[in-house]
Amino acid sequence: MAVSSPTSSSSSSESLPLPSSNFASLPIMAMKRRIIDKILENRVTLIVGEPGCGKSSQVPQFLLEANMAPILCTQPRRFAVVAVAKMVAKSRNSDLGGEIGYHIGHSKILTEGSKILFKTAGVLLDEMLDKGLNALKYKVIILDEVHERSVESDLVLVCVKQFLMKNNDLRVVLMSATADITRYRDYFKELGRGERVEVVAIPSPDQRTIFQRRVLYLEQVAGLLGVSSDLSAYCPGPSPSSADTEIKPELQNLIHDLILYIHEKEPDIEKSILVFLPTYYSLEQQYHQLEPFFASFEVHILHRSIDTEQALAAMKICRSRRKVILATNIAESSVTIPKVAYVIDSCRSLQVFWDPSRKRDAVQLVWVSRSQAEQRRGRTGRTCDGEVYRLVPSAFFNKLEEHEPPSILKLSLRQQVLHICCTESRAINDANALLAKAMDPPDPDVVDDALRMLLSIQALRKSPRGRYEPTFYGRLLASFPLSFDASILVVKFGEMGMLRQGILLGVLMDTLPLPIHHPFGDDSLFLEYVDHYFGGSKTISGGRREMVLMANFCAFQFWQRVFKDKHRLENLKQLLSKEKDKDLKLMFPEIEKEWCDFHNIAQSSFYHVSELYEDTLSSFHRFRPQFISSSDSQPTYYNPYEFDHTCYIECQPSEDKYLHSEDVDNNQPPPEVRKCVSVPFVPPNAFQANAIAENMASIIKEIRTQCTPSESDNGHGALEPEDYVEYGEAPVCVYFLNGYCNRGGQCTFTHTLQSTRPACKFFASSQGCRNGESCLFSHAMRRRTTSYLPPPQCLPEEDGSSTSPLLDLFPTSSEGCILVFDDSDMHFTSSIANRYPSWRILSTSSSSETLFCDSSLADTRIFWGLNHPYQTIISKAGRENPIPWNEVKCVLWFLNPDSYADTPEKQKTILQNFFEHMAIRLLGDKLYKIRVVLTMNNVRFSLLQVEKLARESFFFLGESFPHDSESFGAFQDTLTIQKPMLVSRPISYVFNLHPPSDIQFGNYTSLLRKSLHNK
């Protein structure tokens, strides 16, 4: 399960700049004994202290030294988890992954013996929904930054509270700089008689050891700059409830003038200016205003569409120009920026909320809370004195809300409700009851809407007792690490026979930053980059978002076809080479990054996409829906097979409009970048792009229709194939509705208010219609009435097995045989011989020949004592391979990984070696038609990511089906699965070799053949 959205930022990194040697001077150190005592005495403790006081790094260590391990610490964001874990491990002279570990997303750096574990709130939530109380096998759980009210954080809090009722030994520590103490005390007061939330306040440090922060408001800024005392141009309205939040040109000019004023008055060029603006567009506006001053300023951008870690890494202290950082609220508490002396706060923020009229998430500009403003103030005054400029009047500021509304009150909660209903723990699997117990319960109507929608798409069903229970489809959706809409899209692509294309599109829908580089402030250049990968924008339906999504889809395929396939081939060549190029392996990451830069794509984004892709695919292999059995994994990047790309590299001026700091400091000439000019990188309609784009547009329209309840829908409606058909009636004239149609009786549209309005083409697109209920066009989704419910959209694979699928793979002509790989006791070979001529069976075993007697195998050629992969697939140097590979048409391996290795990593290595050596044999001898059938437990197949291992050696999954144990031998590798609707059974996976193009990579087969037969 995955409820959390993929973000890569930090919140507790605010305390990170302190080196280990400075820990002794932290304000929290004097409170060590008191903190330990209070946590021992109380089940819930709230620790309140200013940013930088040492809460995040020191409290876990206090508890460890008091023998209270294991200890779990949560952070709201991934970057913070890694950063704090590294700092704590370093301070304890411990290797990360040993005593101190962490878990973010798919990355686990920990052992069973780890004593302090750092995780995101989303990871902990997933574990609680998956394992219930068993996920909390810790002595203490620390929930850090509880003031950051994400949906995940609020759900973690309510789940932990429910489990506290069941486990009296559990200790919970809440930590924050700005938490509302009274609210948390009230929230936990029902734990038990005589229990209460104990509050430990960390005193502020000695004033001599901290730097001063001066706060100025709009009226003071106006005085400094000598502008008009009429402040309405910058803050139109006396209070937040009436004032417009729009960032007007006058405010941008004021910010610009303030930056120049600070630069003029501050002699220390190393002191930076941080500007908070709410949107990408407002960042762009200020960026363009600063362009004429790039000789004086080095401008950096912090926005979620830009890789935050790379942006921070680029922020070196510049001694010749002042650093100006333009940032959204990602910089409030997510990052630590060195040498920030000035903060300019627009006091606006972009808020995501559920728009019921558009039936999708939307955004709006809002005034920040005073708590948010304090977080922004905390960005300065750490290493030097700081000044904060709040661009609202002081009286206005005092009327701002104290805290921002929690996310749980602003979203549709569809995905969260589904995940709650999927958990097995009765304490937390009733969505209505659990959400009503949240610190800020959402509107019951919102929860009911979510439940109704999940019922309508048959992700949930109602039990006879009225409980909401997940269907197979619902559990499958909840298992993906994707957003709700992306999860539905993936399944629908699977039903169309394009599962892997759908997974890639679904992952890209949820990914920021996307792989194709978006030069900040230069949208035309970005669209040029997009056009290099997808030129079908004029032939597909949908808007800009669909076009950009398809371009990134093609960019990923291009990376796989041109770069990854090349290095997969190099790996195979190196495998048998006597002189292995060790430097190539070490240099590979840099080579790949350079290649990506040549083609305006981001290496880090590709790896993020790949990780989510494999995780989503693994869920399908665990659940095995009906359509997976015939799902062919041959990638679309092999269409056309003749695809060819040759890089032509030219030096071009850097797209950065300012010089890099190191170039200026060292008096270097203006930087140039090397780019591939062999464009377009992907020709029109390569990789089946247009067909996939049309399918995507159609599926998005269907999803929008499904998830939009019709006013006349009684719960028994089914979608019309064309939901905008007007049944011969002319639609209403939208100009008539607006009062300015000048065609009168000549108009071909109807001028009556009773007529049907034409459909809004934007409403059914991925971005939706921005006009909501005020749109002149219709947002109604037509349905036809039926007297029955349609069948469930996604059913599990049928349990029955048959001999036919496997026997159909065996050669039927007089020539050709099958090879049973490493059948130690001939168990499977004997069973196959009962169904297939024994004289056409080859069988190998790593066991030595014994007194083996089976009359059914009298004509079978058995090769004893052959080890894997050498001897069986490829013989050692100077030895002839005993297997007559020219006769083999099908290779079968009945694999129990535990019989080969005792750890998953070693088992992966066994499988990797198998596919690599098979690829060398089949490519070198041009035996492309040989099929490889791997039979193993599907859960192990998923956990070991076997499909990925095969793909790295050009083997692609063609089909899969249940193993017929009665006909072909009982399979010993069984895994007991406790979770409902998950499958655990032996499956036969059929892999086909798809050789890479010799047009793209030259005559590689002769090199492999030479290596193969010269050994």
UniProtKB/Swiss-Prot annotation:
Name of the protein in question: DExH-box ATP-dependent RNA helicase DExH8
Documented EC number(s): 3.6.4.13, 3.6.4.12
Membrane listed as a keyword: no
Superkingdom assignment: Eukaryota
Zinc finger (C3H1-type): 727-753, 754-782
Transmembrane segments: none
Pfam families xrefs: DEAD (PF00270), Helicase_C (PF00271)
Classification via InterPro entries: DEAD/DEAH_box_helicase_dom (IPR011545), Helicase_ATP-bd (IPR014001), Helicase_C-like (IPR001650), P-loop_NTPase (IPR027417), Znf_CCCH (IPR000571), Znf_CCCH_sf (IPR036855)
Enzyme class: hydrolase
Domain spans labelled Helicase ATP-binding: 36-197
Motif placement: DEVH box: 144-147
Entry similarity comment: Belongs to the DExH box helicase family.
Residues annotated for ATP binding in this entry: 49-56
Keywords (A to Z) from UniProt: ATP-binding, DNA-binding, Helicase, Hydrolase, Metal-binding, Nucleotide-binding, Repeat, RNA-binding, Zinc, Zinc-finger
Keyword field contains Cell inner membrane: no
Protein source organism: Arabidopsis thaliana (Mouse-ear cress)
GO MF annotation terms: ATP binding; ATP hydrolysis activity; DNA binding; mRNA binding; RNA helicase activity; zinc ion binding
Catalytic activities: ATP + H2O = ADP + phosphate + H(+)
Residues annotated as domain Helicase C-terminal: 254-419
